[in-house]
Amino acid sequence: MDSTSSLHGSSLHRPSTEQTRTDFSWDGINLSMEDTTSILPKLKRNSNAYGIGALAKSSFSGISRSMKDHVTKPTAMGQGRVAHMIEWQGWGKTPAVQPQHSHESVRRDTDAYSDLSDGEKEARFLAGVMEQFAISEATLMAWSSMDGEDMSVNSTQEPLGCNYSDNYQELMDSQDALAQAPMDGWPHSYVSQGMYCLGSSDAWEASDQSLIASPATGSYLGPAFDDSQPSLHEMGPSQPASGYSALEPPPLLGGDTDWAPGVGAVDLARGPAEEEKRPLAPEEEEDAGCRDLESLSPREDPEMSTALSRKVSDVTSSGVQSFDEEEGEANN
């Protein structure tokens, strides 16, 4: 007990330098073992920072080296050395006659290749690869251009002939249909085919006696237009017209003759020859069509005009009347 107490006492009464040294050597270890919560996080933080810095440095060096090996170096060789190697090998020139001593030529080529540096060897390899790619690309482009020319020639030749034949066939069919149309149902058939248009919905009604049916002009005019136009007596002599029977076909649009449907054989005297030869303005042509129709529909005989309008209305409304009758019977 005395010895231990004397040791502790002597250690406490030592000079300051020795006390600090013993504190670092002994007491410091005791503190590190006791207060682990305050020292271990510092060590952990230092190790993490060092590891992250080393990892970043190694990663940056690795990335820079890989970029230099895979991007910078081939680009530099592609810009300068590849062209030089292509010119040095003499590609694109006519092949020379092979020498008799092939083994010696192979040996010289091998020696020349072995004397090259690593960059020149890589450039030579890249030049060969680029040559093969160029040959393949040129071949593909030649084939594709030939196929494109064939397709363009076929596409320009076929539509012209097809369109011409289709248009000609449609024209012939329309002409045959017009020639074979029944004469008795001429107003209804021509209106249904779109040859003439109706100016109003009640143009075919029999109650309105003042409506004017004008096949020559292709329209049907109401009483308002009839009132605005001058009468036949005010305009002067009658316009030329030729007679057509009910069995004869109607003239086409723009013809110089008129036809009265439903009226038997009507013979009208032609006007003077100079009236036929004189050119007419568009307004005068419309007036002439109206005057021709007025001359064909006599006003002094109301019974004939009533019969004419009734026949025309019966032709167009026969289908509607039959449908109404069937609907009424079904309702009853």
UniProtKB/Swiss-Prot annotation:
Stretches the record annotates as Disordered: 1-22, 95-114, 222-332
Composition bias, Acidic residues: 323-332
Annotated Basic and acidic residues bias: 101-111, 272-281, 288-302
GO cellular component entries: cytosol; nucleoplasm
Keywords: Lipoprotein, Myristate, Phosphoprotein
Transmembrane segments: none
PTM sites of type Phosphothreonine: T316
Name of a matching Pfam family: FAM131
Residues modified to Phosphoserine: S47, S114, S117, S295, S297, S313, S317, S318, S322
Highest taxon above the source species: Eukaryota
Family classification: Belongs to the FAM131 family.
The name this protein goes by in its record: Protein FAM131B
Organism listed in the record: Homo sapiens
